């Protein structure tokens, strides 16, 4: 899980979602997991 100020899609499988008011990126590749913060 990477914590970044600006999250973005890295590949075509990445999906942007909101969980508990935080913007997150989930993907089939675990290295692409990101959370805004």
UniProtKB/Swiss-Prot annotation:
Family as reported in the entry's similarity comment: Belongs to the bacterial ribosomal protein bL36 family.
Entry keyword set: Chloroplast, Plastid, Ribonucleoprotein, Ribosomal protein
UniProt cross-references to HAMAP family, sorted A to Z: Ribosomal_bL36
GO CC field: chloroplast; ribonucleoprotein complex; ribosome
Compartment annotation: Plastid, Chloroplast
NCBIfam families: rpmJ_bact
Protein name: Large ribosomal subunit protein bL36c
Subcellular location, principal: plastid
GO molecular function: structural constituent of ribosome
One Pfam family of this chain: Ribosomal_L36
Domain of life: Eukaryota
A Gene Ontology BP annotation from the UniProt entry: translation
